């Protein structure tokens, strides 16, 4: 598929210049316009009609693409976007993608057709190339929890590796060495980075984690429960587990209680995200806070600035997670044989 970037390369101009030509901007010289249109004809490029429509209209809607708005984490993201939208007298339209490339692509395209010239996109399935093509066409498109090279000023991210290392170090500092990881079955960057942080923290202490220390499930309570049961069935004598997210950690607590294992007396559990459920589990969940509301607010402001052409292209927006100490982690007791 021929993209706007291919046209820019053929004409020897920037993507922004091609966009101005295609949108009939007066800020382009006749020679440049001719060069661009010759490249368009030569390559057979077909401009995105949706993007062209957005370039000539002011929109009162902001689009958001998330994995699943019914998930508490993504619900918090959307709520934060809506708070900023209301301050700017705008409305929010939402697309669910379920971490599937085709659904992510379709959600973005639908929101563009709905005249959303500011988009906040949580994308895990589309390639960097496809996302950058969308971002070239839509100046108000911002990514959250994803960095695409060359577009860092339009990306809002979290240091997942540091967050996972922080969680694992807390367990290590409480005397734990045999620390399991409850991994997400969704093959996305977040899980890979959290697994990396867990491994690095263990390696720093000379601990070689076995693949058998990893239980895998869907990133929800049911998945956490099944992943914990998987680990229990291996009789690994783990004394602590770090979960991919709080939902999985909550599911793990259920599995442990069902097997008569006291938390944190016999086994410590730490989560990631600090969604509301973390305060209401029994015991309350020690976790790593993902500042998703703050990140979503920044992303929305950036999207509006991008749509208005006022973005600072030198800025970067990477957040650090913080540790939230509650009651699911304690000093390691003598390891007990865990049976299913």
UniProtKB/Swiss-Prot annotation:
Keywords: DNA-binding, Repressor, Transcription, Transcription regulation. GO terms for biological process: regulation of DNA-templated transcription. Residues 1-56 form the HTH lacI-type domain. It comes from the Bacteria. Residues 4-23 bind DNA. PROSITE patterns: HTH_LACI_1, HTH_LACI_2. GO terms for molecular function: DNA-binding transcription factor activity; transcription cis-regulatory region binding. InterPro entries: HTH_LacI, LacI/GalR-like_sensor, Lambda_DNA-bd_dom_sf, Peripla_BP_I. CDD domains: HTH_LacI (cd01392), PBP1_GalS-like (cd06270). Homodimer. Repressor of the mgl operon. Binds galactose and D-fucose as inducers. GalS binds to an operator DNA sequence within its own coding sequence. This is HTH-type transcriptional regulator GalS. It comes from Salmonella typhimurium (strain LT2 / SGSC1412 / ATCC 700720).
């Amino acid at each position: 598929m021929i993209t706007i970037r291919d046209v820019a390369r053929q004409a020897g101009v920037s993507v922004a210049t091609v966009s101005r030509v295609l949108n009939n901007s007066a800020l382009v010289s006749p020679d440049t316009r001719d060069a661009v249109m010759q490249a368009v004809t030569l390559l057979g490029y077909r401009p995105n009609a949706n993007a062209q429509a957005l370039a000539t209209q002011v929109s009162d809607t902001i689009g958001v693409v998330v994995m699943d708005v019914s998930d508490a984490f993504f619900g918090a993201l959307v709520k934060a976007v809506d708070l900023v939208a209301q301050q700017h007298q705008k409305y929010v339209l939402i697309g669910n993608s379920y971490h599937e490339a085709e659904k992510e692509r379709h959600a973005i395209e639908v929101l563009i057709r709905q005249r959303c010239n500011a988009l906040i996109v949580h994308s895990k399935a589309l390639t960097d190339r496809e996302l950058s093509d969308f971002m070239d066409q839509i100046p108000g498109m911002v990514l959250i929890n994803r960095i695409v090279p060359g577009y860092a000023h339009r990306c809002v991210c979290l240091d997942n590796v540091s967050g996972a290392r922080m969680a694992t170090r807390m367990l290590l500092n409480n005397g734990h060495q045999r620390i399991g990881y409850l991994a997400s079955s969704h093959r996305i960057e977040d899980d890979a980075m959290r697994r990396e942080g867990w491994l690095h923290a263990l390696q720093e202490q000379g601990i070689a984690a076995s693949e058998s220390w990893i239980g895998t499930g869907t990133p929800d309570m049911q998945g956490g429960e099944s992943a914990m049961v998987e680990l229990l069935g291996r009789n690994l004598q783990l004394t602590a587990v770090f979960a991919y997210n709080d939902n999985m950690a909550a599911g793990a607590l259920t599995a442990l209680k069902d097997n008569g294992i006291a938390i944190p007396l016999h086994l410590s559990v730490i989560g990631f995200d600090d969604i509301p459920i973390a305060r209401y589990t029994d015991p309350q969940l020690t976790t790593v806070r993902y500042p998703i509301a703050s990140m979503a607010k920044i992303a929305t402001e950036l999207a509006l600035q991008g749509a208005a052409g006022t973005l600072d292209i030198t800025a970067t927006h990477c957040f650090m997670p913080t540790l939230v100490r509650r009651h699911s982690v304690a000093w390691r007791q003598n390891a007990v044989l865990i049976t299913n």
